[in-house]
Amino acid sequence: MTTLTAQQIACVYAWLAQLFSRELDDEQLTQIASAQMAEWFSLLKSEPPLTAAVNGLENSIATLTVRDDARLELAADFCGLFLMTDKQAALPYASAYKQDEQEIKRLLVEAGMETSGNFNEPADHLAIYLELLSHLHFSLGEGTVPARRIDGLRQKTLTALRQWLPEFVARCHQYDRFGFYAALSQLLQVLVECDNQKG
């Protein structure tokens, strides 16, 4: 990625972590359709690989704003996709895709982080991977820890996430009736691939 700073990438990961960790409330719903968010999206679209995914997300947000009871409908989508059995869902856990659920714990220890007691989900939840990537990008931007060490950890985290993210995204596309979370997961996948190519 060329135009986005480490801090901006960190913000995108943190934002995605938040949206995948819990249902949207009214305030978040208003925020994603705001002019401020449109500016943020236009900044992301200045990164060519992200353009199509951001356009897709904006389209799903535009459709969302005309839905009756949008928040309740979206909550139902969230629940059906991420909290039910895995038969017709896209469970956001590494272990649901036969990956080592301990790997993220090792990466968190290496980064000097731990999961928050406020987040009542297993450590291998997608949001934890994204929070870790956000933290690492912020650290890269600050320059207080040697970049090589942070970069190595970022690469390990991306490698672990890329083991199961494509299947998660495919399941979002398959089972998300409305398409908001499918579009969100598509943006995440493109971001992760761009981040990975950064080396």
Curated annotation (Swiss-Prot):
Gene3D superfamilies: 1.20.120.1820, HscB, C-terminal domain (1.20.1280.20). This is Chaperone protein TorD. InterPro entries: Chaperone_TorD (IPR023069), DMSO/NO3_reduct_chaperone (IPR020945), HscB_C_sf (IPR036386), TorD-like_sf (IPR036411), TorD/DmsD_chaperones (IPR050289). NCBIfam families: PRK04976.1 (NF003442). Its main location: cytoplasm. Involved in the biogenesis of TorA. Acts on TorA before the insertion of the molybdenum cofactor and, as a result, probably favors a conformation of the apoenzyme that is competent for acquiring the cofactor. Belongs to the TorD/DmsD family. TorD subfamily. Keywords: Chaperone, Cytoplasm. One of its GO terms (biological process) is protein complex oligomerization. The keyword Cytoplasm applies. The keyword Transmembrane does not apply. It is found in: Cytoplasm. GO terms for cellular component: cytoplasm.
